[in-house]
């Protein structure tokens, strides 16, 4: 696949194909600036070379749109098909100032979080670099707007596909011009992966300036294991210690994600316990009101409970914000569209 390769890699590849280096630069322009979907579109390349590449099975690496869902607030969810017939979701979330793309890193997810639609179907496979990059290009194409921010908060556990994720970040940064500080990688926590991520990011990117978001979703180990079955293998304090190590190695503060589930983890005492855990930590807590999924027992908390939880954290000196809910009328929570289409 050509998508995902850097300008230098495309130049070297073109030379190896018997072409001049500038042919690689032309390819780069058509892949990333123009968003070409096939070699036949790249008419600046010699026709004979294009035909030869097709015969050799060389492809651009774009995915096919299977379904599109647009909410009243213009949040746009795409269901994309890979070349082996799997489907993944990506979401474009627009505001006046920015366009955030929520990308998937795997087909399905092995973490089985009880409140997540994606985890219901398990893991099929990890995505390749070009499949991650394509999601951003697809949203740009459909919404006719340049993405400004990227969040790895779609289907899958990014840290179980670290190299492809980091390679995609390099591409998004260098080839699409999206700054690392505008990219967030979210993880529910997998033992040993946080220290590895810090080292791998430095090796792959030369620096680690993207934001790491760790999904806590509970203020203690017992409740976390109830919500996230895999958490039993990763004690709460060990997870926080690995976050401190990541901060020390990269110099980047950690963001903690906390999904508020009505009547389960949204009480003032939960907020106080969470503040005790992360207080004094160079971090930020991002609260997320639960987005209901079909056939699930969890409830979205009331506005009063959400605001009360946030006030407790603020009074304890914890940096906190509440993520705006988007696309509620179109079931924009991760995995819902794919799950619905598979069941139909």
UniProtKB/Swiss-Prot annotation:
Keywords: 4Fe-4S, Cytoplasm, Disulfide bond, Iron, Iron-sulfur, Metal-binding, Methyltransferase, rRNA processing, S-adenosyl-L-methionine, Transferase, tRNA processing
SUPFAM superfamilies: Radical SAM enzymes
Keyword set includes Repeat: no
Cofactor(s) recorded in Swiss-Prot or TrEMBL: [4Fe-4S] cluster
Disulphide-bonded residues: 102-334
EC number: 2.1.1.192
Residues noted as binding [4Fe-4S] cluster in the record, renumbered to the chain: 109, 113, 116
Leader sequence residues: none
GO terms of molecular function: 4 iron, 4 sulfur cluster binding; metal ion binding; rRNA (adenine(2503)-C2-)-methyltransferase activity; rRNA binding; tRNA (adenine(37)-C2)-methyltransferase activity; tRNA binding
Subcellular location: Cytoplasm
Start and end residues of each Radical SAM core domain: 95-329
Co-factor note (free text): Binds 1 [4Fe-4S] cluster. The cluster is coordinated with 3 cysteines and an exchangeable S-adenosyl-L-methionine.
One record GO biological process: tRNA methylation
Annotated catalytic residues: 89, 334
Ligand binding (S-adenosyl-L-methionine): 156-157, 186, 215-217, 291
Uppermost EC category: transferase
PANTHER family: 23S RRNA METHYLTRANSFERASE, RADICAL SAM CORE DOMAIN-CONTAINING PROTEIN
Record function comment: Specifically methylates position 2 of adenine 2503 in 23S rRNA and position 2 of adenine 37 in tRNAs.
Further facts: Reaction proceeds by a ping-pong mechanism involving intermediate methylation of a conserved cysteine residue.
Name of the featured protein: Probable dual-specificity RNA methyltransferase RlmN
Organism: Parasynechococcus marenigrum (strain WH8102)
Gene behind the chain: rlmN
């Amino acid at each position: 696949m050509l998508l995902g390769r850097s300008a230098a890699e495309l130049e070297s590849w073109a030379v190896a194909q018997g072409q001049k280096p500038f042919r690689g630069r032309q390819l780069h322009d058509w892949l990333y600036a123009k968003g070409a979907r096939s070699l036949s579109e790249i008419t600046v390349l010699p026709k004979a070379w294009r035909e030869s590449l097709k015969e050799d099975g060389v492809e651009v690496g774009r995915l096919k749109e299977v379904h599109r869902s647009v909410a009243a607030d213009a949040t746009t969810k795409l269901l994309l098909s890979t070349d082996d017939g799997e489907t993944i979701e990506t979401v474009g979330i627009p505001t006046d100032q920015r366009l955030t793309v929520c990308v998937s890193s795997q087909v399905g997810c092995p973490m089985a979080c009880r409140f997540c639609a994606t985890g219901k179907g398990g893991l099929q496979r990890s995505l390749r670099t070009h499949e991650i990059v394509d999601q951003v290009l697809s949203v740009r194409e459909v919404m006719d707007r340049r993405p400004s921010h990227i969040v790895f908060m779609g289907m899958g556990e990014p840290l179980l596909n670290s190299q492809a994720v980091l390679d995609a970040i390099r591409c998004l940064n260098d080839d699409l011009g999206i700054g690392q500080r505008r990219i967030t990688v979210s993880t529910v926590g997998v033992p040993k992966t946080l220290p590895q991520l810090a080292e791998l990011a430095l090796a792959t990117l030369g620096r680690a300036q993207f934001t790491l978001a760790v999904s806590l979703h509970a203020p203690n180990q017992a409740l976390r294991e109830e919500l996230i079955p895999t958490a039993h293998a990763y004690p709460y304090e060990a997870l926080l210690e690995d976050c401190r190590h990541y901060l020390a190695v990269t110099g980047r503060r950690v963001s903690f994600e906390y999904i508020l589930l009505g009547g389960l983890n949204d009480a003032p005492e939960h907020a106080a316990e969470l503040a005790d855990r992360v207080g004094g930590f160079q971090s930020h807590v991002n609260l997320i009101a639960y987005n209901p999924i079909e056939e699930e027992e969890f409830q979205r908390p009331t506005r009063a409970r959400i605001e009360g939880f946030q006030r407790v954290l603020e009074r304890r000196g914890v940096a906190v914000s509440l993520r705006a809910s988007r696309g509620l009328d179109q079931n924009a929570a991760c995995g819902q569209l794919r799950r619905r289409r598979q069941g139909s």
